[in-house]
């Protein structure tokens, strides 16, 4: 239980923060329909963990194996939830998919605190986008990165809903988290 929980929390925290920052950078740029996209990507956060888990359980159990059989992809022909080795990845996918929304909002708010004149000065100095991000944007949003790292680590360490709805701690207790173990044993 401890090994799974820590492995899940470390992988989830890294994935959700990288994906959230990339999504926030995209949603903070000048694109058409930015407001609509910001509303759409937040939907996973509104849905309950059990509801999302049951939806993904159906996808992992029926839809992906059907696609795998039709396309002759041997890895997808069986449910990933039945695999002792890979079931944790399914739980991770669901957890990350649901957590990206809130972290993206925090990153967007951080990106909007960076003054435009700093970017104008870097453009005059000849900085490219990569240098601009690493030398200006990232250091200025570091407090928001810290907040997201702490919150996502806490949330991934407390994983419960996804375990209940996807695997009930199985197969062979390979996805049993600390919180699920406490629930199960009292």
Question: Which sequence ranges carry the predicted segments?
Answer:
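A structural signal for multi-pass alpha-helical bundles of membrane permease subunits
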Residues: 1-186
